[in-house]
């Protein structure tokens, strides 16, 4: 006998995951994975620091004990507060008491949503968005994603508010919150300050919570200049939210910016809502490993490493992005110009925008041993868009783009014919 939850997952969610990511889930090494957003460029640079730390014999029995403090390791919460105060320009100083640690950004978000939403409550979120958020919203918490269709030309503009307002009024559920990804995944762009302020004002007026997912905050390609002073990352914490007291929350993780997805250490920040902090701390109690918090203290969140990520790390991402951008321009492929992150959103199927054509292209990708993420998995309404990740070493990226070139050529020479038989590829 199994739970209804288990049966539902095996009937719907798990088959979809296996269909799209089966080769990766089963460890097939013959495929080139450009679907996973990892900063592998930084991983290689960080590896000697990890090895040195393990060789230095700086361990104590404390690393084998339970973590101390409400909300996770106090030292790491203090270091994250220092990072945010130095690089997110918060309107009010962030204190470690505002921070709750989790085993990665997703589990921090799980705890935050659990503190805000009852089962069945709605959360506004604009599409496209990273499908992993559905796990935190619907799978782990039984809340409901209220998908907002914002036209691309309005997505990062103040004009987007009217689309959120329309979705809120027509939602079949009680809407408790709104999630934004800033920097955005998969579009690779930052929200301008004026749009963020409009979003905070909207949430304050409607008395709903704003959750800003800022896990790519330091993964920037473009710096503000005199010609483009508004470029760059703006945190929701930097805004005057005095009229939205207790409603603004930020999720952050070390995974993306610092190239350490496997360490599993994230956090949420709530400056003016002690009830949310305490509830979240209860949900994540003893969730984070003392090994992870030790690595964060000794290696990841040192001043030297943060400076390295903010300078050299940005250059690595910019160089890889340029390779990706040149490839797409060379093949006359439409894409969303990115200014942050380690991925690009591209219309690989061109003018062929039917579901059948996207299925055909995905079959061609599988045949050529290349893994990309389809935009429809990100709730993109128009088939044919894909997210391509480029935060890997240059040789892997070159190999992946060679395979993508072959896929594009084969797709251009192939017409979809019904009935569609995936096995023929």
From Swiss-Prot:
InterPro entries: Aminotransferase_I/II_large, Ethylene_sulfur-biosynth, PyrdxlP-dep_Trfase, PyrdxlP-dep_Trfase_major, PyrdxlP-dep_Trfase_small
MF annotations from Gene Ontology: pyridoxal phosphate binding; transaminase activity
Pfam families tied to this protein: Aminotran_1_2
Keyword Transferase: yes
Transferase as UniProt keyword: yes
Class of this enzyme: transferase
Required cofactor names: pyridoxal 5'-phosphate
Domain of life according to the entry: Eukaryota
Biological or metabolic pathway of the protein: Secondary metabolite biosynthesis
Disulfide bonds: none
Family of the protein in this entry: Belongs to the class-I pyridoxal-phosphate-dependent aminotransferase family.
Role noted for this protein: Probable aminotransferase; part of the gene cluster that mediates the biosynthesis of an unusual class of epipolythiodioxopiperazines (ETPs) lacking the reactive thiol group important for toxicity. Firstly, L-tyrosine is prenylated by tcpD, before undergoing condensation with L-glycine in a reaction catalyzed by the NRPS tcpP leading to the diketopiperazine (DKP) backbone. Afterwards the alpha-carbon of tyrosine is oxidized by the cytochrome P450 tcpC to form a hydroxyl group.
Protein name: Probable aminotransferase tcpI
Native organism: Claviceps purpurea (strain 20.1)
């Amino acid at each position: 006998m199994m739970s209804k939850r288990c049966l539902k997952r095996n009937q719907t969610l798990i088959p979809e995951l296996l269909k799209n990511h089966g080769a990766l889930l089963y460890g097939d090494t013959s495929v080139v994975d450009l679907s996973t957003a990892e900063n592998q460029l930084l991983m290689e640079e960080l590896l000697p620091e990890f090895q040195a730390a393990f060789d230095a014999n700086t361990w104590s029995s404390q690393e084998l004990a339970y973590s101390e403090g409400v909300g996770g390791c106090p030292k790491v919460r203090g270091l994250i507060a220092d990072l945010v105060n130095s690089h997110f320009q918060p309107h009010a100083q962030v204190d470690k008491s505002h921070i709750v640690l989790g085993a990665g950004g997703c589990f921090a978000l799980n705890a935050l949503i659990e503190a805000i939403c009852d089962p069945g409550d709605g959360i506004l979120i604009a599409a496209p968005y990273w499908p992993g958020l559905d796990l935190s919203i619907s799978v782990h918490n039984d809340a409901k994603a209220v998908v907002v269709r914002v036209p691309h030309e309005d997505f990062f503009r103040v004009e987007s508010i009217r689309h959120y307002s329309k979705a809120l009024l027509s939602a079949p559920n009680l809407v408790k919150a709104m999630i934004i990804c800033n920097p955005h995944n998969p579009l690779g762009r930052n929200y301008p300050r004026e749009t963020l302020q409009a979003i905070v004002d909207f949430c304050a007026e409607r008395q709903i919570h704003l959750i800003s997912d800022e896990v790519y905050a330091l993964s920037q390609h473009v710096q503000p200049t005199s010609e483009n002073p508004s470029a760059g990352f703006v945190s929701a914490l930097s805004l005057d939210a005095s009229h939205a007291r207790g409603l603004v929350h930020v999720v952050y993780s070390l995974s993306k910016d610092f190239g350490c997805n496997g360490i599993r250490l994230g956090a949420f920040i709530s400056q003016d809502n002690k009830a949310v902090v305490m509830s979240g701390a209860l949900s994540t109690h003893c969730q984070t490993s003392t090994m992870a918090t030790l690595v964060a203290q000794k290696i990841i969140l040192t001043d030297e490493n943060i400076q390295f990520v903010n300078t050299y790390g940005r250059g690595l991402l910019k160089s890889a992005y340029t390779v990706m951008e040149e490839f797409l321009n060379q093949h006359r492929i439409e894409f969303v110009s990115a200014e942050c992150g380690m991925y690009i959103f591209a219309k690989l199927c061109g003018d062929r925008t039917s579901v059948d054509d996207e299925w055909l292209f995905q079959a061609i990708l599988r045949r050529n041993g290349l893994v990309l993420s389809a935009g429809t998995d990100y709730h993109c309404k128009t088939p044919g868009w894909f997210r391509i990740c480029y935060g890997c070493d240059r040789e892997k990226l070159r190999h992946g783009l060679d395979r993508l070139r072959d896929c594009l050529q084969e797709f251009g020479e192939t017409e979809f014919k019904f009935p569609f038989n995936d096995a023929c590829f």
